[in-house]
Amino acid sequence: MNDYNHYFHFPREEWRKLEVSKDQILTAEELEEIRGLNDRISLQDISEIYLPLIKLIAIQYHEAIFIHGEKMEYLKKKESRAPFIIALAGSVAVGKSTTARVFKLMLDRWFSKTRQVELVTTDGFLYPNKVLEERGIMDKKGFPESYDRDRFAKFLTDLKANKEDVEIPLYSHFTYDVLDETRVIH
């Protein structure tokens, strides 16, 4: 059976029965703290949906690390840690940010802080408002043409190439604009 040719659909009742050996790893207070405005997510959702998904992500992560190690050994290259990137996509206001914060917190705990988990939003890769105005596309903010795709591609390339310090542009939800500041991940 080739897993890459199969997509699976699990009804919630079936999905929630998947065994996960971890205890509940979020409290009601933590969930409330990371929940976005109008997001409907409960501790039951965390237990029945997110926890099995985190377990599946952990399985995929360990498989990717094993394959990377085997490849480095075969190529007689010094083994370096390859990043494992998870991307979330969806339309506006569907809960991507809340899901990302839940993932980060749960993955931090799943790996007992032995792996660095970073949360990177694409907001920082938007063109600054000034550029959007100059190009007459301010009304397209958030659409593909409003993103600095070259900067985003360079970020991903640097990340995958294991560059020591990778800069992430920052975005302010107070000014609704890209900041001059960056954050560095190692």
Question: What does each of the following model-derived ranges do?
Answer:
Residues D3-I85:
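Extreme N-terminal, non-catalytic leader segments
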Residues Y176-H186:
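ATP-dependent NMP and nucleoside kinases share a basic, alpha-helical "lid"
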Residues L105-E118:
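Post-Walker A helix-loop "phosphate-sensing" segment adjacent to the P-loop in P-loop NTPases
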Residues R35-I49, E118-T121, F125-T175:
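Conserved nucleotide-sensing/catalytic segment adjacent to the nucleotide-binding pocket
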Residues I86-L105:
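Glycine-rich phosphate-binding P-loop
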Residues P83-S91, E134-K141:
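Short acidic, glycine/Ser/Thr-rich loop/turn "cap" segments at secondary-structure junctions
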Residues M72-L75, I85-S91, L119-D123:
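Short, glycine/charge-rich beta-strand/loop segments that flank catalytic centers
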Residues K104, D108, A153-L156:
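Short, well-ordered alpha-helical packing segments
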